Every structure is written in structure tokens, then in C-alpha cells.
């Protein structure tokens, strides 16, 4: 067995909690957990703890929830824990240079892409949107840049034609802990081999916006189908009908050319709602009107056929 490391864990969402759970059964010593402050959630806007906090408190671990790690007293809390390494997974706060240098082995991060491709906030969604054939996780040594540190370990997985951001998230939440445990063993043994990122291969995964998820019919059917999968389950691709936002959960590409203007409804039947795009035809299969549950197109046509008259154009 490798040396047992003193670890500070910093993370916030469920993705991070799955990594903490793996660490708890790895034989290492978790000396402290940092997570974001409780946030208002749900209809009642009640303050809710992060998934990482819930798990940490359940396991009796000391939890710290600073708003920032810039104040000296918060940095001192990190120093007082005398960690060998700090593991950061979707924490959501910037780590100042002083904090990065505190642990003996520095700070390492689990990132949801095969760096240097897709540095930034939304790597899972951007890899789908771009039509990448594969993605994965990279365990990297953190520095002051945005996902610019040396790479310590990578694990890859294929992106299938059915994958959404939700399914890919689950796949990477399985891969990440595997890569993390292996990397910690290598750090403890002194066998880690840091690899500098090739700056010529860098792409950036910009944060998502709801407006970006609005369907632009001038794009190709293939691009729109990828967009629908990339933005599922958040923020969800959508279009506007009679002033109402209607979410699109699933669609397929019909490999046929059409001279109709982008956004023109070509057919509306139980096989789908076929719409002309900038290149090809998009077949809408599952949609969700405002205030309703997601439903098949057949059910939607039973209640709202007037929305989808062939020849009409969708906004």
C-alpha cells in the first residue's frame, strides 16, 4: 500500500461528492472539506447545503464554507490543516497562489475533458456540441491559470450518438474517481509524470447561457441535434411558439435536402415534427411546453396541432 496522504478536499456539486466518496474508501486521511456556502434552492428558496457538505457531515469530516479564499484568515485555515495535497473537483472558488503552494504536493484538479481541449467551465457540453468522438477526465497539477497546469493522468471514453450532457456527466463521474485514486498513488510513490499542455491544441469551453440554447434554425440539422443533447438537462434547447418557451428534449436528423426556408414546418405526424434547417431536416421527437411535463410529439399534436401546421415557420 502506498503512503497514506493527508488530503484537503474542495468541491461542491454531486460530481464532486462522488469523488469525495471514493476518497473516503481509499485509505487516505481526509483532514478537511471545503465547499461553497449553503444556497437558496427550490420554490421556497430555503438554504440548502451542497452535496459535498451533506456527505462530509454524514462522515463526520470538518467542513469549511468560506465565501472566498482570498482573506488571510481563510488561507490560514488551509495552512493549519497541514495537508500533503489538496484535491479540487468543481469547487467553484478561485484558489490564490498562496493556497496552491501550501500543501506539500500542491493542489490537483479533476477536469471533465481531455486537456488541453476544452479548458473552462462547460467542457462536457462543449464536447457534445462540437461533435467530438471522445472525451474523458484529466487530473492536473493546479497553477494560477484557468486549467493550464501540467497533466498528471488521463482517462478517456467514447461519446455515443445517444449521449446527452447528463449521461456523459455520469460516465465522467465514474472515470474521475478512478483517475484520482491512481494519481494520488503515483504522487505518494513519487512516480507521477507531469506532462506540459500543448498550447497549440487549446480550446475553451465557455459557460453556457439560456439564450445560447435557443434553437437557431439557420444552423444545420446535425448541429441542432447535437445542441439538443449538449444542453440536456440544462439549460435545455428551446424555441418560442405564441410567446411561450417550448423545450426540446429529443430530435433526430433526416438526411434529406429541402429548399424550404429554415424554420419551416414540413410535416407533423406521430413520427415527428419535421422542420427545415440551414442544412437538412430536424425531426422533433419529444418536447415540453411551459408548465407541462415533457411529452412525445404525438401527445403534443393531440393537444396543440395548431402550433405545427405544415408551411408555417417556427421562430
From Swiss-Prot:
| Catalyzed chemical reaction(s) | L-methionyl-tRNA(fMet) + (6R)-10-formyltetrahydrofolate = N-formyl-L-methionyl-tRNA(fMet) + (6S)-5,6,7,8-tetrahydrofolate + H(+)
Q: Where is this region: C-terminal domain?
A: 210-315
One CC-aspect GO term: cytosol
List keywords of the entry alphabetically. Protein biosynthesis, Transferase
Any one Gene Ontology MF annotation carried by this entry is: methionyl-tRNA formyltransferase activity
Kindly give the Gene3D superfamilies that the UniProt entry links to this protein. Formyl transferase, C-terminal domain (3.10.25.10), Formyl transferase, N-terminal domain (3.40.50.170)
One of this protein's Pfam families, by short name?
Answer: Formyl_trans_N
What are the binding positions for (6S)-5,6,7,8-tetrahydrofolate in this chain? Answer: 113-116
Q: What is its EC number?
A: 2.1.2.9
Q: Which SUPFAM superfamilies match?
A: FMT C-terminal domain-like, Formyltransferase
Q: Map out region (N-terminal domain) in residue numbers.
A: 2-189
Domain notes per entry: Composed of an N- and a C-terminal domain. The N-terminal domain carries the tetrahydrofolate (THF)-binding site and the C-terminal domain is presumably involved in positioning the Met-tRNA substrate for the formylation reaction.
State the similarity comment.
Belongs to the Fmt family.
Name by which UniProt lists this protein: Methionyl-tRNA formyltransferase
Gene field:
fmt
Amino acid at each position: 500500500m502506498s503512503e497514506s496522504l493527508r488530503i484537503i478536499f474542495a468541491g461542491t456539486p454531486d460530481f464532486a461528492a462522488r469523488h469525495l466518496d471514493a476518497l473516503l474508501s481509499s485509505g487516505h486521511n481526509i483532514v478537511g472539506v471545503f465547499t461553497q456556502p449553503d444556497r437558496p434552492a427550490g420554490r421556497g428558496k430555503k438554504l440548502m447545503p451542497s452535496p459535498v457538505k451533506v456527505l462530509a457531515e454524514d462522515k463526520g469530516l470538518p467542513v469549511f464554507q468560506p465565501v472566498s479564499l482570498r482573506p488571510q484568515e481563510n488561507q490560514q485555515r488551509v495552512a493549519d490543516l497541514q495537508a500533503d495535497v489538496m484535491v479540487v473537483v468543481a469547487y467553484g472558488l478561485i484558489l490564490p497562489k498562496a493556497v496552491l503552494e501550501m500543501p506539500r504536493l500542491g493542489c490537483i484538479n479533476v477536469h471533465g475533458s481531455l486537456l488541453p481541449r476544452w479548458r473552462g467551465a462547460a467542457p462536457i457540453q462543449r464536447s457534445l456540441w462540437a461533435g467530438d468522438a471522445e472525451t474523458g477526465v484529466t487530473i492536473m497539477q493546479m497553477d494560477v491559470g484557468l486549467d493550464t497546469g501540467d497533466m498528471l493522468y488521463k482517462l478517456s471514453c467514447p461519446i455515443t450518438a445517444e449521449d446527452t450532457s447528463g449521461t456523459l456527466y455520469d460516465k465522467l463521474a465514474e472515470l474521475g474517481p478512478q483517475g484520482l485514486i491512481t494519481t494520488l498513488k503515483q504522487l505518494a510513490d513519487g512516480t507521477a509524470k507531469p506532462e506540459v499542455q500543448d498550447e497549440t491544441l487549446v480550446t475553451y469551453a465557455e459557460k453556457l447561457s439560456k439564450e445560447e440554447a435557443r434553437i437557431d434554425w439557420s444552423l444545420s440539422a446535425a448541429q441542432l441535434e447535437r445542441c439538443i443533447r449538449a444542453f440536456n438537462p440544462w439549460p435545455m434547447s428551446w424555441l418560442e411558439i405564441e410567446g411561450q418557451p417550448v423545450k426540446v428534449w429529443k430530435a433526430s436528423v433526416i438526411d434529406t435536402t429541402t429548399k424550404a426556408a429554415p424554420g419551416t414546418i414540413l410535416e407533423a405526424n406521430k413520427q415527428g415534427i419535421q422542420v427545415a434547417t440551414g442544412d437538412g431536416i430536424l425531426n422533433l421527437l419529444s418536447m415540453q411546453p411551459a408548465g407541462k411535463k415533457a411529452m412525445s410529439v404525438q401527445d403534443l399534436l393531440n393537444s396543440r396541432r395548431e402550433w405545427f401546421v405544415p408551411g408555417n415557420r417556427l421562430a
